[in-house]
C-alpha cells in the first residue's frame, strides 16, 4: 500500500549549503520531518553543482514522517544573469538594456532547463529562454 502524503513543501535551497536554519528548518519542522536527514541528502545530491546556486526542490512529506524530494533545474533568470555577467535585470526592460547574451549561450541555458520546460522541442525552449532574457532587459544576439 502506498504511503499517505500529508503535504508538499517547495523551497529554493543553495546547492551544497542546506542547513537547519530558516527557511528549511521551520518548513520541515512543522511537518515533523528529520531536518538534518534532508540537509545531508540534499548536500550530497548537489555536490557536483556550483556551490550557492539556488536549486528549487519539492519535498513530499508522508504521514509516517518520512519524505522524498525532487530537485529541479536552477531558475532561468539566475542562469541568464550569470551568462550576461550582471547582478540584476533592468528596471525598464524594453527601454534600458543592461547586457547581452549570444544565441549559443541561450541554447546552453535551454539545454540545462529542458527537463523542467513544457517546450516540445529545443527551438521552442530557446525561444522561451530568449523571451525571459528580453523581459529582463537583456539583448539576445543572433535571434
From Swiss-Prot:
The membrane spanning regions, by residue number, are none
Q: Name one GO cellular component term.
A: cytosolic large ribosomal subunit
Biological process (GO) annotations held by this record are: translation
PROSITE patterns given for it? RIBOSOMAL_L11
**Which key words tag this protein in UniProt?**
Methylation, Ribonucleoprotein, Ribosomal protein, RNA-binding, rRNA-binding
Q: Which domain of life is it from?
A: Bacteria
Recorded GO MF terms: large ribosomal subunit rRNA binding; structural constituent of ribosome
Q: What is this protein called?
A: Large ribosomal subunit protein uL11
Amino acid at each position: 500500500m502506498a504511503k499517505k502524503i500529508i503535504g508538499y513543501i517547495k523551497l529554493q535551497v543553495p546547492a551544497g549549503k542546506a542547513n537547519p536554519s530558516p527557511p528549511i528548518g521551520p518548513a520541515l519542522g512543522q511537518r515533523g520531518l528529520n531536518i538534518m536527514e534532508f540537509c545531508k541528502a540534499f548536500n550530497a545530491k548537489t555536490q557536483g553543482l556550483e556551490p550557492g546556486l539556488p536549486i528549487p526542490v519539492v519535498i513530499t512529506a508522508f504521514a509516517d514522517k518520512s519524505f522524498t524530494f525532487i530537485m529541479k533545474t536552477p531558475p532561468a533568470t539566475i542562469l541568464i544573469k550569470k551568462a550576461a555577467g550582471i547582478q540584476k535585470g533592468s528596471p525598464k526592460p524594453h527601454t534600458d538594456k543592461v547586457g547581452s547574451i549570444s544565441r549559443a549561450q541561450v541554447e546552453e541555458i535551454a539545454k540545462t532547463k529542458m527537463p523542467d520546460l513544457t517546450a516540445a522541442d529545443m527551438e521552442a525552449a530557446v525561444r522561451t529562454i530568449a523571451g525571459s532574457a528580453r523581459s529582463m532587459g537583456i539583448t539576445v544576439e543572433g535571434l
